Amino acid sequence: MGCSVVGNCKSVMLMSRMSWSKLALLISVAMAAAMTDSPPTLICMGILVSVVLNWIVCAVCEEASELILGVSLETTRPSPARVIGEPVFDPRYGYVAPAIYDGKSFDVILPISALSSASTRKETVEMAVENSRLQPLESSQTPKSLVALYSQDLLSGWGSRIKGPDGQEYLLTALHVWETNISHLCKDGKKVPISGCPIVASSADSDLDFVLVSVPKNAWSVLGVGVARLELLKRRTVVTVYGGLDSKTTYCATGVAELENPFRIVTKVTTTGGWSGSPLYHKDAIVGLHLGARPSAGVNRACNVAMAFRVVRKFVTVENSELYPDQSSGPARELDAETYTERLEQGIAFTEYNISGITVKTSDREWTTAEALRVARYKPLGGGKAWGDSDDEDTQETAIRPLNYQRAGSLRGSPPLANLSSTRATSGVTKESSIPTACLSDPLESRVAGLEKLCAERFTEMFELLRQSSQNSKSSLGQAADRKQKSDRSSSKPEGLKESKRPPICNWQSLTSKPSTRGPDPAPVSAESPGVVKTSSQKSKRSRTRGKSTSRQVPASPSPKSGSATSK
């Protein structure tokens, strides 16, 4: 408790040194005015006293606000020592190398394991690029919107102040920087705590790594941070990146930034460790956000954060739209659902990004949103509501169009197609109802179901009519032929009648009979009325006659009398 009070008093004394000097000036002016008796001199001294007094009041109010907000002084980060010789192996410490710092020479232990593990982090290292050198700057030469971000006493990255369409001011930086538990903003040696500030928008994609944080206005005003505007990057633009060891020891580097796709930027600008989240400035406007390096390609990488806000159309206002028009003539254009499908059929690959729950798909020069594809897939109907989103209670007004088949239409106040079957069989007389003029049925499925039901009923009625007419009609030719066939003798035998046995067939032929001997001709068929077929009774008569003739031709055993007659 006592330590915290002493620390606060010390910080108040450090920040109030200018106020004490102003108060001393006021006292000296007042004493000089008291020792003079000349009215003009007294008037001049009074004006001077009022000016100094106003100066003191303003300084005291500013220091009081800083004290309330918890403003503290930035801890100056010492410059690193430089290695001036080759590392050698020491059995006691491992690899050591001679270094120099502040004019003094000493040995530095080199942690080889830490260096090897750090070298595997390909996406977070920074790179020095050819023809892009770091230039030292004074803190007053840096952009007004640039701030340093601290995690307690450790510099984690950089950010900037931008304004949204609602007038709210936001902190823009890289998401991986914000995830290091940023606790303070720092500008010109002063730090302001910002713990607990809410996130407005963010994207965790490696190519679109940014976060938008809502910071109170008094925090910006205490540090004297200005507001920057967002502009869309051209296809190839010269940009400047700022960074440093702290908010007072800063550097800048200039190079060329190019677009790889609507969201991905590659820069040929030299950066060092701790520069992540630093804006890419082009003529005092922010056109990108530095993320890290791509060692395999020898370039640094950044994101086109202005394009992200332009696509989602909220959070931040993007200015200077003529640099990146929405028309098809621009370097990147928005696709509709039909064109997007054509691009997929052509084999063009799209990269998917997620910006605060909004899905965006981009190719090298084109982009679209999942919401636009969904809206195009489900076009609203006449009621203004998408068909897929309509409820069972919702009703849609449809145009009345008669169907193109006989007696089509539904009656008012009745189920669809329930009364289309208007014919009934009444003692062979068909009664037909009037033909409706229009069909007021809404669902097409109901119409088809009713039509199928009607066809089934009509088929059943026709079948019943045909069956009744075949049983009851007495004048048709078919009935007369049927009666005549029933009057003839039938070849079918009663169940109790035994089957007639055929005479046994002789196994040897008569010597007197010739092989060509024919039996008696069958009885001639009696001619009946034309068109009448032979009856089964006539066939049975012929079969009995043929059996009798066959039994007469079988001779008895040969005798000598017949043999002598033959020889004669």
From Swiss-Prot:
Site features described as Cleavage, chain residue numbers: E130, N131, E319, N320, E397, T398, E499, S500
A GO BP term here is: proteolysis
Q: In the record, which positions carry Phosphothreonine? A: T339
Tell me which residues this entry annotates as catalytic.
Answer: H176, D209, S276
Task: Give the signal peptide, or none.
Answer: none
Q: Where is this region: Disordered?
A: 403-435, 469-568
One CC-aspect GO term: membrane
The record places the site described as Interacts with viral RNA (covalent) at Y324
Q: Where is the composition biased (Polar residues)?
A: 419-435, 469-478, 507-516, 554-568
Where are its TM segments located?
Answer: 10-30, 41-61
Ranges for domain Peptidase S39: 129-326
InterPro entries for this protein: Peptidase_S1_PA, Peptidase_S1_PA_chymotrypsin, Peptidase_S39B_luteovirus
Query: Per the record, a Pfam family?
Result: Peptidase_S39
Question: Compositional bias of type Basic and acidic residues: which residue ranges?
Answer: 481-502
Top-level enzyme category: hydrolase
Q: Where on the chain is Phosphoserine found, per UniProt?
A: S390
GO MF annotation terms = serine-type endopeptidase activity
Q: What residue spans carry the Basic residues bias annotation?
A: 539-549
Keywords per UniProt? Covalent protein-RNA linkage, Host membrane, Hydrolase, Membrane, Phosphoprotein, Protease, Serine protease, Transmembrane, Transmembrane helix
- EC number(s) in its UniProt entry? 3.4.21.-
- Under which name does UniProt file this protein? Polyprotein P2A
The organism named in the record is: Cocksfoot mottle virus (isolate Dactylis glomerata/Norway/CfMV-NO/1995) (CfMV)
- Organismal lineage: Viruses, Riboviria, Orthornavirae, Pisuviricota, Pisoniviricetes
